[in-house]
Structure formats: C-alpha cells, structure tokens
C-alpha cells in the first residue's frame, strides 16, 4: 500500500510520512544476507534448533521502544550520499542506532524455518532489520523473505486500489468518487475550533494563536498534533 496525493493535497505528504505503519512479514531463520532480505548475498547459514516457545519469546521481546541500527542497504543519506550507494561500492560506515517503537506484534504462523507475523510500528522502523535482530537474539540469524505494508496511519490496504482499477475508474469517469478527502489524514487527532478570522492565516500555513480559538476539548502537550 502506498499513498497517492493530488494537487494541493501534497502539503500533507509529511504528515503521512510521520504516520505509524503496519506490515505483514515473513522471516527465514538460519540464514543471513548482506541486505537483511532474500535478495542479498548469503553470508551465513546454520541449522535452526530453537523451539517455538523460544521463537515466540524472542519476537515478542521487541515490542516497545527499541534501538535499531539502520541497514547499509537503505535510502538514508550520509554526507549527501545514500547508504545503499556506498554499500554497492563495498563501503560500510558506522551508523548510529535510532529509537523506534514497535506498537504490537502478532505471530501468524511458525513453520520452521519460516515465521509469519504482523507488526505495527513507528515511522523509520526497518522490518528487515527487525527480522535480522530477531535472528541474532535466537543465535541462528534471520532474513526477511517477504513484506507487505498493510496500513499507513488510518488507511488500510483493504481500501487501496490497484493501478488497473484506477485506470478503469478514469475510463468510466468515476475516479473522483474514490478520492479520499485530505481531512481523513487528521481523523485520529483531537480537533480545535478556530474563529472565522483565523481561516485565511491557517490556510496559508501560519500559526494559530490562543485568541483565535473558539473551542478546545482537552489540554494539549507541547508538540502534540491536533
């Protein structure tokens, strides 16, 4: 699932980028690669001897705030160069760990060496790194076999359209009926009612001052989205 913004809706792109994500992933135990997924060069292989209970405990131990070291094969930039560009040149540099949050994990199936699970997480979480870290914790290594993003913010994959469906809607003249209003991005947040005289300032992206507020339903913390 990937969002598609049109026209003035591009201004909320950063908000979607900051949204939590949900994924369905399959990992393979007993194997590691240089990319942490099935497309990379195999680095190690070993027999998987851990039990299902040990696997479950290891996976669930990652729920909450954790530190992750971004993989070399990623689009993060260092000194203007993307890490994956450096990795392809055989260059590996030190990456600082980052704090991410795993909100929940549900283990769907264990059919060794494969484990399928769903995960909800904060922005900036690398699921293939999570798979690799799970393998490290179990002592046998692991890689990510497959990944599907199933939710972005409040938008589930069930509401997504395939490109072929979009093309058909365009031909039939019904595409606008399926376009979601940008307000939907903010449905998960508390609302503030502003006075009419603040409309122009807000539409131009300016700050809202307390004297321009008509109604507030709760007290907000510094930095909280509304």
Located regions from the model:
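Flexible, glycine/proline-enriched loop segments at strand-loop-helix junctions
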Residues: 40-50, 72-74, 92, 117-118
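Residue-level signal for inorganic ion chemistry
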Residues: 4, 25, 80, 130, ...
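Single conserved hydrophobic/aromatic residue that forms the stacking wall/gate
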Residues: 1-7, 12
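Extended alpha-helical targeting/anchoring segments
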Residues: 74, 78-104
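A structural signal for short, well-ordered beta-strand segments
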Residues: 25-27, 105, 117, 147
